[in-house]
């Protein structure tokens, strides 16, 4: 790591001077990525009233001159902005996460910290090989600051196509940038041409208001950062990062999504031995018998956790419900539920228990609930229906993650929250929803949209179901469910979401009444063997709505997931990602409608090497899963 240096610009940082009509010297700062693929230019506007930036990728301007800055409740800026002192830094290192999509992440960038006369903040800009990021850093002497809105623009081609959603869990649709009329979620994927894709988003959001993207002048290509409320500080502070990534294929952007982790602080949990990724089964009956059955099933099938969802402490939406008591909601289950008995039984079997707690209880009782659940031996909590958007709730949620870490509790957050990389700093933050998952019965084309947009942000809990009728009726096939479990990354992977194991009680019209029983069929071998975190990840092919082909490595094994959308595909996948000189057994899970089985999953085994090519035809709205094991 290089230390910051003053007035000694690395090769990738260029300072351009221009003489104005008033014989004043104006600066333009140009910062390039280490591989020179990205270049960020910063200058003042013609009348010196605004800061402007632009971004080039491989010689193509992907963000035309765009305004930077904020609006404040009180005027803090002067009429003239001048670029002042510049501090430079370069980084060339890597780091190993507690868990991830890769076992090691590169962190290579050039950086400038630019000061200004006339402004209360500096601008920190980083040029990575994966993209550009910048944030605003407000100084100690700024006093109390109230930000009413953000002015940061992204000036894009008006005719470029973007995949957008209004909410974190709503449908993702494709439209021209010029047609965007309301605030849209981040990250946003934009296609400029057949060989140029751009992603815009936010990283390092901890105690600021969340950003969305809005086109305030429909018909143009100018998107503006739209804050979900005002922001107030009475101390020095930094804004979240705004990032722009680009690549020739959407899969290359997805492969580089660790950029968001790089833009967060390193791990602050000294002892991480208690942080455990794994597969989770939900206990759907809220009964002792059902809990025991789930524990036995988890132990038998290499699952790591059992989760009790809403209802174990009463009606989750009733403020009178007390999350320090075990009081089953009678509308969800007749019980009985001896929860502590199940937790102790699970511990004997090496299985962790996760409990759901709605935000209503957390906001009132979090300082009581966390130590209590720790004393019960609970492994983690699923925070339910958390508030997102305004600064108040952003700050509350991340403080709630930190408080959970103090009690050695892992966290899964539902419903609208999307990650911005905080799991690097607090890796007990295992996963989150903020995704159009199986609860929404998303079709495969929508899932593929999700993979290439939402998953840029990081892990997504999409509640993978398997035996539920909706799989065949609405969601494609059972093999596409398998493929999703590979393609949609989540360190806590919830499987068999709407299902229950043999031994769970059936109560007509109540808990367990219409929930399918998990049959002990060969398909389960796939989920038994499935890891949830990885040593390496490669996106081999894909395009939103049409196709996703992703391979992931864990130890000596590789897993391939392929999902089709609106069209069928004849896959031809070179297996050159496998180790050379080694034979592998490929266990292939494919859809075969002719089979007289409920899931229509055909399982076959073949021998392959890294010289082999996998040839498979996949129907539209379908999928394929393959496990490669060394022989």
Residue ranges and their predicted role:
Residues 543-580, 624-625:
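Carbohydrate-binding surface patches
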Residues 2-11:
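Bacterial N-terminal signal peptides that target proteins for export
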Residues 605-631:
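C-terminal beta-strand-rich structural cap/linker in extracellular carbohydrate-active enzymes
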Residues 237-305, 309:
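An acidic-aromatic substrate-binding cleft motif
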Residues 311-477, 481-482:
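Aromatic- and carboxylate-enriched substrate-binding clefts and catalytic-loop regions
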Residues 26-264, 597:
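N-terminal accessory beta-strand-rich subdomains and adjacent acidic, glycine-rich linkers
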Residues 20-21:
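C-terminal motif of bacterial Sec signal peptides marking the signal peptidase cleavage site
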Residues 474-554:
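Glycine-rich, aromatic-lined ligand/substrate-binding cores of catalytic
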């Amino acid at each position: 790591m290089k230390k910051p240096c003053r007035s000694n610009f690395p090769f990738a940082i260029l300072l351009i001077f221009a003489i104005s009509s008033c014989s004043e010297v104006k600066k333009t700062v140009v910062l390039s990525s280490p591989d020179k693929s990205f270049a960020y230019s910063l200058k003042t506007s013609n009348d010196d009233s605004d800061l402007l930036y632009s971004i080039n990728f491989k010689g193509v301007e992907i963000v035309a001159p765009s305004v930077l800055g904020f609006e404040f409740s009180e005027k803090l800026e002067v009429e003239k902005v001048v670029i002042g002192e510049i501090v430079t830094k370069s980084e060339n290192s890597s780091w190993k996460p507690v868990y991830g999509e890769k076992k090691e992440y590169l962190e290579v960038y050039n950086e400038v910290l630019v000061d200004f006369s006339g402004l209360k903040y500096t601008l920190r800009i980083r040029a990575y090989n994966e993209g550009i990021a910048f944030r605003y850093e407000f100084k100690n002497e700024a006093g109390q600051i109230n930000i009413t809105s953000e002015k940061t623009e992204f000036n894009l081609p008006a005719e470029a196509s973007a995949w957008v959603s209004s909410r974190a869990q709503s449908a993702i649709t494709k439209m021209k940038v010029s047609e965007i009329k309301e605030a849209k979620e981040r990250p946003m994927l934009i296609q400029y041409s057949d060989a140029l894709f751009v992603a815009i988003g936010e990283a390092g959001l901890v105690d600021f208001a969340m950003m969305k993207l809005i086109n305030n002048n429909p018909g143009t290509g100018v998107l503006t950062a739209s804050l979900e409320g005002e922001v107030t500080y009475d101390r020095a502070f930094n804004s979240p990062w705004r990032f722009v990534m680009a690549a020739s294929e959407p899969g290359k952007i997805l492969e580089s999504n660790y950029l968001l982790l790089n833009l967060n602080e390193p791990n602050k949990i000294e002892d991480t031995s208690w942080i455990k990724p794994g597969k989770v089964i939900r206990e759907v009956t809220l009964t002792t018998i059902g809990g025991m059955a789930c524990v036995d099933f988890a132990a038998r099938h290499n699952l790591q956790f059992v989760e009790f969802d809403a209802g174990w402490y009463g009606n989750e939406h009733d403020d009178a419900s007390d999350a320090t008591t075990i009081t089953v909601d009678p509308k969800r289950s007749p019980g009985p539920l001896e929860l502590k008995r199940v937790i102790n039984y699970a511990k004997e079997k090496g299985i962790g228990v996760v409990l759901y707690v709605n935000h209503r209880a957390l906001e009132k009782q979090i300082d009581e609930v966390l130590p209590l659940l720790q004393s019960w031996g609970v492994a983690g909590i699923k925070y339910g229906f958390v508030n997102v958007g305004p600064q108040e709730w952003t700050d509350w949620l991340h403080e709630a993650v930190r408080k959970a870490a103090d009690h050695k509790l892992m966290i899964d957050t539902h419903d609208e929250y999307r990650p911005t990389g905080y799991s690097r700093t607090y890796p007990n933050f295992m996963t989150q929803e903020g995704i159009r998952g199986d609860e929404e019965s998303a079709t495969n084309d929508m899932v593929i949209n999700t993979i290439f947009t939402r998953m840029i942000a990081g892990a997504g809990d999409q509640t993978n179901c398997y035996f539920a009728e909706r799989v065949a009726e609405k969601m494609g096939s059972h093999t596409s469910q398998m493929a999703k479990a590979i393609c949609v990354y989540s360190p806590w992977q919830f499987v068999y979401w709407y299902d229950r194991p043999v031994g769970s009680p059936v109560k007509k019209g109540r808990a367990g009444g219409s929930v399918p029983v998990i049959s002990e069929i060969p398909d389960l071998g796939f989920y038994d063997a499935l890891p949830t975190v990885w040593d390496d990840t490669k996106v081999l092919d894909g395009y939103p709505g049409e196709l996703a082909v992703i391979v992931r490595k864990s130890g000596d094994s590789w897993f391939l997931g392929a999902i089709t959308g609106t069209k069928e595909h004849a896959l031809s996948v070179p297996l050159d990602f496998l180790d050379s000189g080694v034979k592998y057994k490929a266990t292939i899970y494919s859809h075969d409608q002719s089979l007289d089985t409920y899931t229509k999953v055909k399982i076959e085994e073949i021998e392959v090497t890294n010289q082999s090519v996998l040839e498979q035809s996949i129907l539209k709205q379908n999928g394929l899963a393959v496990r490669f094991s060394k022989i």
